[in-house]
Amino acid sequence: MKASKALVRRIRQDLMSKTSDAEKAAIRNCERLGYKVVRQQPILTGQKMYFADIYLPDLKTIVEIDGAYHYTKCQRRKDNNRSAGIWHMGYHVVRLSNHDARDINKVKAKIKLIKRRYRK
C-alpha cells in the first residue's frame, strides 16, 4: 500500500479527533508512568496500514484499546490477525479493555509484563 503523506496525515488527524474517553485515559496513564506516547501511529504490515491507538516508541510497543465490539467473534479474529501482523514487524502489542485503560495499575501491569517478557 502506498499512501501519500498527506492522506496518512488526514487519516491520523481524523482518528485523533475521535479519541474515546478510554483511549484518553490510557494515554494519560502511559504518560504518568513516564512513557513517551505517540497517538495513532501508522504501522505498515505487508500491504496493510494500521493506525495504532497508542505507540510507546521506547518499548516498541503498541497499546490497543478494545471497546465492546472488539469482543465479538468476528472482531476478535480481525484483532488477532492485526496483532500477529504487527508482531511480525517487530512490535509488541498490549490490548486493554475500556475498563482497564482507565486503571493506571492495570496499564502498568500489562506494560510490565511486556517489558519482562521481551527484555532487550
What are these regions (language model features)?
Residues 1-120:
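Nucleic-acid endo/exonuclease domains
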